UniProtKB/Swiss-Prot annotation:
EC category name: ligase
Lineage: Bacteria, Pseudomonadati, Pseudomonadota, Gammaproteobacteria, Vibrionales
Organism: Photobacterium leiognathi
Protein name: Long-chain-fatty-acid--luciferin-component ligase
Classification via InterPro entries: ANL_N_sf, LuxE, LuxE_bac
The gene coding this protein: luxE
Recorded superkingdom: Bacteria
Keywords for this protein: ATP-binding, Ligase, Luminescence, Nucleotide-binding
Length: 373
């Protein structure tokens, strides 16, 4: 199994409806009703695929009284992400698994997720799809500075790998090695792109970008980006929660440090190792769920969907993965909202509020895992 999967974005074959949506459509042109229709069709198709090709998942469905003749995607059994910490669940044949990716593992046991080539290609497609919220850029119009390792150094740690995939889409300079930030190289790379007259995109974990801002302040380094720079964060603050800034204060820090024209130039990405898709923000900093993913907020006790806009336990069904059934319930409390006309960015958004913090709430999810062991 190789962690150094060689993907050429120009050679990916678009052969199915889901691939057509992921690789060729734009999130800016799909109406909410169209997205909902696509979602139901693709999620049902994914369920039938995993039900018929994964005996462990089929068993899990059957003991809950569910067979392949379901009528609604809400009837699809979901399982807790904690299951991936204790079981190697995969639909793809072992010979087709490119790598077992792991969570960043801020504490405790790490999750292990199998991915085949098609799943990884579709993950890349979700990055390209989400980047369209920034605008339509040709390769020669935009260059990136990534405060992380390239994909050959990211190994199997998931979010480092996800963030490194941008190098397949645009010219990218990487300025972190072995978790050591080269601040001088980062600033030189930003200035080099600016001199070329190209659009700039700075990418990294929020804490690394926070450290860059403080480095620039300490060394009296100014960078007047104006309207020609995007900053994309991802991965959260992890073990640096004590130093974490709220979104408003973080936005303000970046606005001042880089002399940005507008807060819409700052975006955040959501992803987790058990999910095969990245959620990008629109210009209003709302994280959008692509139409091949079904997101719900569930009551932590009954595991039934709560009202639109209410807090609940986050659950996702992701049709893009062929290597494992992505029908999961997480340890995040969040809010799902549905945006319809006349909103300029129609679709479904998610807002992650916090992690579960009580044994009682976690027990609701963990008890489900025993059925798969």
């Amino acid at each position: 199994m190789s962690t150094l999967l060689n993907i050429d974005a120009t050679e990916i074959k678009v052969s199915t409806e889901i691939d057509d949506i992921i690789f060729t459509s734009s999130p800016l042109t799909l109406l909410f009703e169209d997205q909902e229709k696509i979602q139901k069709e693709l999620i049902l198709e994914s369920f039938h695929y995993h039900y018929n090709h994964n005996k462990d998942y089929k068993y899990y469905c059957n003991i809950q009284g569910v067979d392949e003749n379901i009528q609604s995607i809400d009837d699809i059994p979901v399982f807790p992400t904690s299951m991936f910490k204790y079981s190697r669940l995969h639909t793809a044949d072992e010979s087709n698994i490119e790598n077992w990716f792991t969570s960043s593992g801020t504490k405790g046991v790490k999750s292990h997720i199998a991915r085949d080539r098609q799943s990884i290609e579709r993950l890349l497609g979700s990055v390209n799809y989400g980047m369209k919220y920034l605008g339509e850029f040709h390769e020669h119009q935009l260059e990136l500075v990534n405060m992380g390792p390239d994909r050959f150094s990211a190994s199997n740690v998931w979010f480092k790998y996800v963030m490194s995939l941008v190098q397949l889409l645009y010219p990218t300079t990487f300025t972190v090695e072995n978790d050591e930030i080269d601040f001088e190289q980062t600033i030189l790379a930003l200035k080099a792109i600016q001199r070329k007259g190209k659009g700039i995109c700075l990418i990294g974990p929020p804490y690394f970008i926070y450290l860059l801002c403080h480095y620039m302040k300490e060394h009296n380094i100014e960078f007047n980006a104006g309207a020609h720079m995007f900053i994309i964060t991802g991965g959260g603050w992890k073990t640096k929660q004590k130093e974490a800034l709220n979104r408003q204060d973080f936005n303000q820090l970046l606005m001042e440090t880089f002399s940005l024209f507008h807060e819409s130039q700052i975006r955040d990405i959501f992803n987790q190792v058990e999910l095969n898709t990245c959620f990008f923000e629109d210009s209003l900093q709302r994280k959008h769920v692509p139409p091949w993913v079904y997101a719900r907020a569930l009551d932590p006790v009954t595991l039934t969907p709560v009202e639109d806009g209410q807090e609940g336990l986050m659950s996702y069904m992701d049709a893009s993965s062929t290597s494992y059934p992505t029908f999961i319930v997480t340890d995040d409390i969040g809010i799902v909202r549905h945006l319809k006309e006349p909103d300029p960015f129609q679709g479904t958004t998610v807002e992650i509020v916090r992690r579960l913090n009580t044994r009682e709430q976690k027990g609701c999810s963990l008890s489900m895992a025993t059925s798969l062991k």
